[in-house]
Every structure is written in structure tokens, then in C-alpha cells.
A protein has these predicted regions:
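Middle-to-C-terminal accessory/interaction subdomains
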Residues: 2-129
Length: 129
């Protein structure tokens, strides 16, 4: 659901640079405490980038492809759920929302690239119980 993703948290605020706190999840705490998991996760990030799947340019091309598929449905969507309506208060049109998604992808991709470059894959402290 777009209003709870791509830098949105359901209240129409732009949260593009807020880091996701994996420490809030017991599962992620335990996984990230394992050096083998951190190593595999980092390797997967780099592999998917090298294959072009997670390259920023590829992600943006994918957004553009979805745009061309969805454009014909936009009028019906806004007829059903008008911009700045009672349950969704936002004046952005389809094009503005796509630009926000692309902006978010650029910011998040850079954050993740830095995160994985700086990730320690050596031993970590045991996950808290």
C-alpha cells in the first residue's frame, strides 16, 4: 500500500531519510548477530546490484514501465479516491507521486549502499533475548 511505503507512513509526511531500526525486531536482532548472515546479506546486495536488479537505474526504469501500464487507470483511481479527499489528504497528482517514489528510491539506494559498504561481517555481540 503506497501510503505506508516509499517514505510515507500513512499520514502524508515525507520520511525519506528515516532509517529503519532493525533492532526493534527480535528476528532481525538475532539474524544480524550472526556473522554468516551479515556476510550473506551483504553479498546478496552486491550480487543483485551487479546483476542490475537493484541498480538504481534499473529500479527507475521499472517505475517508468509500471507508469505506462497504470496511466490508463489513473482517472478511475482519482474518481474513486480523489486527491485531497476526506480519507486521503494529498494534492499530488500521479506524476508528482511518481517523482516522489523516484526520489525515495534514490535516497534509500544511497543509504543502503553506504550501509552495506560499512557493515561489519566479523563477530558480533550475541543478540539480546
Amino acid at each position: 500500500d503506497y501510503d505506508h511505503s516509499y517514505g510515507r507512513n500513512g499520514d502524508n509526511e515525507m520520511n525519506f531519510d528515516r532509517w529503519i531500526d532493525c533492532e526493534r525486531s527480535l528476528l532481525f536482532q538475532r539474524l544480524m548477530a550472526q556473522p554468516a548472515y551479515r556476510k550473506a546479506l551483504r553479498q546478496r546486495w552486491y550480487a543483485l546490484n551487479d546483476q542490475g536488479i537493484f541498480k538504481l537505474a534499473s529500479l527507475l526504469v521499472r517505475v517508468d514501465a509500471y507508469q505506462s501500464q497504470l496511466e490508463q487507470l489513473v482517472p478511475a483511481n482519482f474518481a474513486q479516491w480523489p486527491a485531497n479527499g476526506p480519507v486521503y489528504y494529498d494534492d499530488n497528482d500521479f506524476s508528482a507521486e511518481l517523482n516522489l517514489m523516484k526520489k525515495y528510491l534514490g535516497i534509500r539506494h544511497k543509504m543502503l549502499t553506504t550501509y552495506f559498504a560499512e557493515m561489519s561481517i566479523g563477530p558480533a555481540a550475541p543478540a539480546s533475548e
